[in-house]
Amino acid sequence: MEIRYATNPRDFKNYDNERVREDFLINNLFEKGNINMVYSHYDRLIVGGAVPTNSPLHLEDKETLKTEYFLERREVGFFNISNNKGKITVDGEVYELDHRDCLYVGKENKNILIESIDSDNPARFYIVSATAHKNYPTQKKSLQEATHRHLGDDSQSNKRDLYQYIHADGIQSCQLMMGMTFLSENNMWNTMPPHIHDRRMEAYLYFDIDEDEKIMHFMGQPNDTRNIVVSNEQAVLSPPWSIHSGVGTKNYTFIWAMAGENYTFDDMDHVVKNQLK
């Protein structure tokens, strides 16, 4: 597991493009036959990807976590971002995940196996884990069951549908919040005007992006912003002090995940567009 350390916003002002990408962009998450993970010191969030093929993949990393099993002091959310079915076995109980299904697994579940139904057409699982203080029940939720919010409009090029899966009024968790947002056709902006939530960090996974299309992800303090050019199935870590917004060369989908102090989705400090530099 790769480890990423936290960054002071004063130091961030001196980063060149290469350093920004090294610290905040996550690529190569989805590798056939493997689980790849990044441990962030922002709220101890783990971001990962799994593409099981011929044999199940076991969610574990004793060396990094120094625990007997992965969820000894953690909770985790899985999303199947592929069109291929997969399944996750939690201490012997099997959960089948179709396209855009989410599975939450709580603290103290010991044996987590990740599999594809068809090894020739493997599922692609996005994984996010946060620290946990108590056990919440394992629960699966489909896109149709998620809480739906319609946001934006065509005039601002930010018309989008946001689906909340793991949150206060959905799947219960200690601190992990996860959901998925779809940009409508001919709409390319997400989270503009932007906001900051100093109580929580956030991670974005951008996907459903054609090979020759890109996302410009904006980050930094409102008066000192930078951009990261993002390709399909790459993730970005967003510090609590940073805005997080993006625009694509075409519409796209992203999964957002948050962890931190407050468990309220709307706890955010809005930034006026005129403040941006």
Swiss-Prot record:
Its EC number is 5.3.1.17. The keyword Zinc applies. One of its GO terms (biological process) is pectin catabolic process. Zn(2+) binds at residues 195, 197, 202, 244. GO terms for molecular function: 4-deoxy-L-threo-5-hexosulose-uronate ketol-isomerase activity; zinc ion binding. CDD domains: cupin_KduI_C, cupin_KduI_N. It is an enzyme of class 5 (isomerase). Gene3D superfamilies: Jelly Rolls, pectin degrading enzyme 5-keto 4- deoxyuronate isomerase, domain 1. The keyword Repressor does not apply. It catalyses: 5-dehydro-4-deoxy-D-glucuronate = 3-deoxy-D-glycero-2,5-hexodiulosonate. Disulfide bonds: none annotated. Belongs to the KduI family. PANTHER family: 4-DEOXY-L-THREO-5-HEXOSULOSE-URONATE KETOL-ISOMERASE. This is 4-deoxy-L-threo-5-hexosulose-uronate ketol-isomerase. The gene is kduI.
